[in-house]
């Protein structure tokens, strides 16, 4: 099974999402799972069309609270109220503003209430240069092994220094990191948790990425905004 998840970040419009969903290439649901994080504003609008198109919708940043005086936040209970059952949690662009403790609380409540949670992890450029990448990422995962709902999670490994850049991918490093994460999680939980790769995934490098057998799928940012490019990525993963 391959997971191919589009993260529109804060780039979506109704027109863009509608065009994306209505122009997706055909795919085998038994082999590929397609997901879209369009921006929480648009989740309710497109929940029915996404279901018809067999696309899983994801919230981008659920609150650590269920309800209360938290202006501007969206809780997991509110997501469930509009039939949204999945979320991304801990993306590097979110981690800039929140401590690891807050991210862990977001992860825990999402795992408690939602059906699927994609937990984003990734090291800084300094950690990469100092050969501390794996320790950096495992520290981000240290607490989740004690949470309930581990079979609900997917890990998206996105080296921070590779997101939104044209840097050449270091495939040796990617394999080292994904193998290290998989081994750590299996040793701690006994569960084979899927690991996705994110970080400047596009139609130019997808061939080589698909050849990396440890990768269970992809979290795709900018390249997903063009449905034709996204379709090429799907086709390569078939």
Curated annotation (Swiss-Prot):
Gene Ontology cellular component annotations, sorted alphabetically: cytosol
SUPFAM superfamilies assigned: Triosephosphate isomerase (TIM) (SSF51351)
Catalytic function, reaction form: D-glyceraldehyde 3-phosphate = dihydroxyacetone phosphate
Positions that bind substrate: 7-9, 164, 200
Root EC class: isomerase
Keywords associated with the record: Cytoplasm, Gluconeogenesis, Glycolysis, Isomerase
Catalytic residues of the enzyme: 91, 158
Keyword match RNA-binding: no
Location (main, coarse): cytoplasm
InterPro entries found in the cross-reference section: Aldolase_TIM (IPR013785), TIM_sf (IPR035990), TrioseP_Isoase_bac/euk (IPR022896), Triosephosphate_isomerase (IPR000652)
EC number of this enzyme: 5.3.1.1
Domain of life: Bacteria
Compartments reported by the entry: Cytoplasm
Entry's Gene Ontology molecular function annotations: triose-phosphate isomerase activity
Pathway the protein contributes to: Carbohydrate biosynthesis; gluconeogenesis; Carbohydrate degradation; glycolysis; D-glyceraldehyde 3-phosphate from glycerone phosphate: step 1/1
Subunit structure, as described in the record: Homodimer.
Family: Belongs to the triosephosphate isomerase family.
Protein name: Triosephosphate isomerase
């Amino acid at each position: 099974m391959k997971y191919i998840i589009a993260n529109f970040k804060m780039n979506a419009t109704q027109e863009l999402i509608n065009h994306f969903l209505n122009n997706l290439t055909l795919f085998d649901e038994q082999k590929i799972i397609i997901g879209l994080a369009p921006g929480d504003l648009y989740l309710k609008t497109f929940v029915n069309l996404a279901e018809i198109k067999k696309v899983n919708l994801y919230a981008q940043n659920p609150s650590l609270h269920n309800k209360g005086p938290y202006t501007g936040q969206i809780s997991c209970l509110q997501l469930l109220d509009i039939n949204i059952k999945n979320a991304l949690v801990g993306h590097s662009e979110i981690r800039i503003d929140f401590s690891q403790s807050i991210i862990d609380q977001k992860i825990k409540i999402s795992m408690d209430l939602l059906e699927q949670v994609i937990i984003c992890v990734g090291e800084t450029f300094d950690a990469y240069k100092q050969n501390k990448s794996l320790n950096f990422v495992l520290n981000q995962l240290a607490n989740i092994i004690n949470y309930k709902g581990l079979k609900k999670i997917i890990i998206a490994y996105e080296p921070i220094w590779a997101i939104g850049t044209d840097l050449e991918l270091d495939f040796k490093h990617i394999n080292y990191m994904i193998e290290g994460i998989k081994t750590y999680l299996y040793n701690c939980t006994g569960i084979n948790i899927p690991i996705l790769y994110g970080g400047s995934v596009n139609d130019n490098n997808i061939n080589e990425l698909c050849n990396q057998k440890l990768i269970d799928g992809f979290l795709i940012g900018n390249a997903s905004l063009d449905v034709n490019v996204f379709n090429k990525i799907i086709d390569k993963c078939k």
